[in-house]
């Protein structure tokens, strides 16, 4: 599956212009095929179904 990867709080992995190599690394560490910085967050391709991705209908992002 494709989507924005999220961290433990449910927030997207933030990125900035020029950080596509960092996003690609984070995506492949999660067993995705590749990824890039779709500013302001990392977008991944080919993620396994077990990896949680951002869902705007069920956004649990918090600052806690």
From Swiss-Prot:
GO terms for cellular component: extracellular region. InterPro entries: LCN-type_CS_alpha_beta_dom (IPR044062), Scorpion_toxin-like (IPR003614), Scorpion_toxin-like_sf (IPR036574), Scorpion_toxinL (IPR018218), Scorpion_toxinL/defensin (IPR002061). Residues 1-62 form the LCN-type CS-alpha/beta domain. It comes from the Eukaryota. One of its GO terms (biological process) is defense response. The keyword Transit peptide does not apply. Disulfide bonds join 11-61, 15-37, 23-42, 27-44. Keywords: Disulfide bond, Ion channel impairing toxin, Neurotoxin, Secreted, Toxin, Voltage-gated sodium channel impairing toxin. One of its GO terms (molecular function) is sodium channel inhibitor activity. Expressed by the venom gland. The keyword Acetylation does not apply. It is found in: Secreted. Belongs to the long (4 C-C) scorpion toxin superfamily. Sodium channel inhibitor family. Beta subfamily. Inhibits the sodium (Nav) currents in an apparent irreversible manner. Produces small depolarization and induces repetitive firing in squid axons. Is specific for arthropods (crickets, triatomides, crabs and squids), but is non-toxic to mice. Shows antibacterial activity against both Gram-positive and Gram-negative bacteria. Has the structural arrangement of an alpha-helix connected to antiparallel beta-sheets by disulfide bonds (CS-alpha/beta). This is Toxin Tce3. It comes from Tityus cerroazul.
